Amino acid sequence: MAKDKYIEIKGARANNLKNINVKIPQGKFVAITGVSGSGKSSLAFDTLYAEGQRRYVESLSSYARQFLGRMSKPECDFIKGLPPAIAIEQKVISRNPRSTVGTSTEIYEYLRLLYARIGKTISPISGQEVKRHTTEDILACTRQYSKGTKFVILAPLHIVEGRSLSKQLEMYIQEGYARILVKNEFIRIEDFLDKANSGEMLSPEVSMRDLLEASDEKFKKLMTETGMEIFLVIDRSSVSEEKDDISRLMDSAETAFYEGDGACRLLFLPSKIAYDFSTRFEADGMTFEEPSDNMFAFNSPLGACPTCEGYGSVIGIDEKLVIPNTSLSVYDGCVVCWRGEKMGMWLKEFIRRAEPYNFPIFKPYFELSQKEKDWLWHGLPSEKNREPHDRVSIDEFFRMVKENQYKIQYRVMLSRFRGKTICPDCHGTRLKKEANYVKIGGKSITELVEMSITNLKIWFTKLELTEHEKCVSKRLLAEITNRLQFLLDVGLGYLTLNRLSNSLSGGESQRINLTTNLGSSLVGSVYILDEPSIGLHSRDTARLIKVLRELQQLGNTVVVVEHDEEIMRAADYLIDIGPDAGRLGGQLVYAGPASEYSTTDKEAQQKLLEKYPDSYTIKYLTHHEKIETPTSHRAWNRFIEIKGARMNNLRGIDVKLPLNVFTVVTGVSGSGKSSLIKGILFPAMRRHLDLVADAPGEHLGLEGDVNAIKHVEFVDQNPIGKSSRSNPATYLKAYDAIRSLFANQPLSKQMGFTPAYFSFNAEGGRCEECKGAGYVTIEMQFMADLVLQCEACKGKRFKHDIHEVQYGGKNINDVLNMTVNEAIEFFADEKNQHNNGDFDSCRVIVSRLRPLQEVGLGYIKLGQNSSTLSGGENQRVKLAFFIGKEDQEPTLFIFDEPTTGLHFHDIKRLLHAFNALIERGHSLVVIEHNLDVIKCADYIIDLGPEGGDKGGNLVVAGTPEEVMQCKKSLTGLFLTQLLDKK
């Protein structure tokens, strides 16, 4: 390949990279891999992307650059052949509470334009299309009748401001008009005036003289009261195709629109069938707003619901608080506020009044129809005829409570049931009601965004349009359907377009970001992705690879930091950074095309292993190292059972979770795994243990050996500390022993230094210039804040005299800069231990740091800022903390995709750590897609079969072998394929 076809990186030194030279082929699909902490992200993001971004910013004007902050040059000699770089990371795209999947992918913007262009406004009264009429519409109407059919062109009588009806009629006579239509009878204007002047009555209450004297407003009022209409006869004609007759009809129609203030009526004789036309956008007495793209924008005041301002929710009475257990019936007391002797009277009265309507008082709330729920909340049909204070419904109950909130007990009650609830006006659609009148194919835009992406794609495929509509919407429909297909291809078909962006996982956000970039069709760029397979079931990985290939085939270079075996094998080129993590990594241990490591030839594999002996990736890809499949599984007899789980898409399932074993919850994205474990099990267990927790999702309860569990821990990937000074040593309590050790040294005793002097969280020994952080942040107003090394302590965090205290030739700063592996070796060295105090402290330090080594984090520094740790590293630090805990009370540990960011080699270590926890009498529940972890489980709970509304069922539960035998289980299918290969 020619030299200019490579992106060439020379001397990369970011973080732990060891001055490496890397060539990345342009226009190819490239995977960067290696163990956790080896330097993959340093190469991909801190070097490649950082330089691409810096060059882009440098090309902008100085005015634009001041808003983008300072971009420092990455630590490398040079980078050649680098195209514009785009990074797609595992971050939630937007924290804006209005941002949705639809707006993030730009599909909603195209939908808005589509509805503005070809949407038909439908009257909610008659169901007829609302449109502005022209004279052409009147001509078309006459052509429905046979030649010679007589008709009259009429204009509603309109009084000009400042005139009476009498003067208006006289003006019509002067203009040459002779007749009007009153009560479906034609009458000469002079005859009508004579009748009126003679005192003839129009109705028992209104005389015709009153009518003649009426001005514009009074005339309209009298017309409404009497139900009468008066029309001016503009012309009389008959259906004809003669050119002159058509010309006359068009002129008369124009005149009728003018005289009738935009309205006109065509009356056919003798049938007296009437057709109304209007140049205004109105029908059935209503004036409608003409569709525009802003009409469908909930981010614009022109389209947003005025009540909730486009959020879709307001603070009000929360249905989930009023009816927390939807499996109860009305009779059994599902309405919590109607319990007790006093408030129970409301329940008794509702049951009594509901009897004539056959209201199902014994049916569980979740089985009630929407109409029945409306009766319970807003009142039975008969309630409308009663006085407000005599009505019985949940709404009326809370109206009564609000009226009495001057009493403390009612104020407390109101606060108990207040929360974020669906907007009562827009019902959560976020748009003003006028937007719902506009339809395409019988559906409003709010109905479309509530469909799953899978169903929405099918709907667009079946959509029937006229030739004109197809022509107008061709490009819009292409953009919408392409983007929907991209979302389906990355396994997000279960989402809806109105799903809030801030409720998505990092993996879902990244894949949505990926589809947005695919939709933009940029070419000649380098896309850098951080583990796009996170959160993806094996079923969806092939589709993700197809999407990445499409991105590459547009003319882009696609670089993925990835650990998934399928993606590594699908790549054109593999770059392996290693061999280990931290200071033991940062080297290029393999770089080559897929054909090299995909070979099944044993001799070729052996040569490859000899050529690249330090590459763990090559060892695993050639199956010379592997994660062993257990030959047996732990037996269990105790369990926790979740009964009737129906949170989100769960279908009222009962699920048993065995105790003292390794349980893995599997299923495609959106099948209900997180709802079951994070949404129900974790908060329900915390509440059972009398701990503070969010309200668990909808379920009947927990049964089984719940009391066997004394603690419950959710080990997530959030940062380990809230303080910017937190680090692994402080989190694992090893730093307490380190401080005691230094305070026990002779110089410390002489100077009066207590353990507090060696803390960077307390005054005394820390540098007060930077408050123990080692750096200072300088605010730059319009530019990005500058983070600079503290000049007082030179980044060492402590005062100079504290650094004079040494143990084994090392001061406190030297110890904080040690890796975990170095620290264990240093503190275990008996040569440094001079007294019993030193021995005891060192034993504690080593015992608390050892679990970090066991979970594969021996490369991180003791004083490493917690904000610099990856999600996977944070999770393993927490795991190490629990492994190191000395109490042995049975604990239920819950992990959500712990293999995120982990290489095969790291997963092997992680499984050893999991087994260590189980051997101590603990129980593990893990949500996972990684097949190497799933095959090692003692028990698998597989949800599905699909995501979204096609998920939420328990497909199969049992050992891996039992799951593999289930033909309905996608997890079982891929597990079988994995074990057959190996």
Segments and roles (model prediction):
Residues 1-982:
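Conserved phosphate-binding elements of NTP-dependent enzyme cores
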